[in-house]
Amino acid sequence: MKKNKPGFTLIELLVVIAIIGLLSTLSIIALNQARARSRDARRLADVKQIQTALEMYFNDKGSYPTSTTPGASIASGTTIYMDIVPKPPTPADYTGCGNSAYTYTVTLVNSLASSYQLQYCLGSNTAGIPAGLNTATPSGVGLRSVQ
């Protein structure tokens, strides 16, 4: 008479491997979604920081700076309002925006920059702001851009 040796059958091993594969796939998907939400939160925080620097500049100078460039500073003379204008986190999470960099434009009235528009792109709805290209102005951050 043969004695059964303790161990696992091939079917049991395949079932366990399939379950482990499924769990790892689900965790990777959840991790990627969390990373995308984190990048959107960072984009929104960057825009709010840029707005704060622009408003401090406006309070001191009576107009907004005529240009800002990611990687440069917002400064006037010896006063630095923002050391480095942030670049958006990569990768871009929304393909409908084209260039995902923050785009700054000013409205000139009597050669003074009296208003600005700061365009930014979100990959998903964040803090009530829809995915896609949005515009921040002195009035707020959640204005939808007209395309």
Task: Annotate each predicted stretch with a short phrase.
Residues 28-48:
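Aliphatic-rich helix starts adjacent to a transmembrane/signal segment
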